[in-house]
Amino acid sequence: MKYIHKYLPVDKSAKILDVGAGTGRYSVQLAEEGYDVTAVELVKYNLGILKKKNSAVKAYQGNAMKLSRFQDKEFDLILIFGPMYHLYSKEDKVKALTEAKRVLKDEGVILVAYCMNEYSVLTYGFKQNHILECMENGKIDEKFRVQPEEADLYDYVRLEDIDSYNDAAEMERIQIISADGPSDYMRPVLNAMDEKTFQTFIEYHLSTCERLELVGAGSHTVDIIRKRDNKKHE
């Protein structure tokens, strides 16, 4: 939530759109803080759980690539914290970004989460000893890039992929962070920590999550973007 709050307007009348809201982990909390929050979720089951929470969130079923319910330049802040995991082509990812851009106010900000390629290769490929099998069946190519299909549920990207989506959608980066840092590599160690040591780890993560040399190595990144000022690029 630290980076959501960093880019939220102080004015509680600010309008937030949570695309791929799931069961409302972020949208419900933001609504409880007094913000005007709208949630879009593709999966009916998740949407049902969200609505049962009886929050002030306005929740609808919908697709990240088609936000036709909403007007142009309607929202101050947009969260896309799930859809990019499950969109498998560059075209679809760019379409989701372009739709979010359309409903974003000119001075607004979008936070977009991605699953990262290297985490998948290192953990499932090497740690769990599937690397040779995956390379033989084409799930991981000769450049160690994951090649998922829809049946695999998740898509994985590298930083250069994220850059290409932003370029295609004419968005520019404010900053990019590692959402998890090294934590998903060391869950048993974290679970065994005493509270003081764990809090020190959290402090470490927050102090390093913006370091570019670490961003692509974690399991997830959050890209924080805004509309590109094309005058700067002329």
Language-model segment annotations:
Residues R25-K66:
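Class I SAM-dependent methyltransferase SAM/SAH-binding core
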Residues M1-K12:
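Conserved alpha-helix/loop element of class I SAM-dependent methyltransferases that forms part
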Residues I174-E234:
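A C-terminal cap/extension of S-adenosyl-L-methionine-dependent methyltransferases
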Residues I110-G138:
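Conserved class I S-adenosyl-L-methionine
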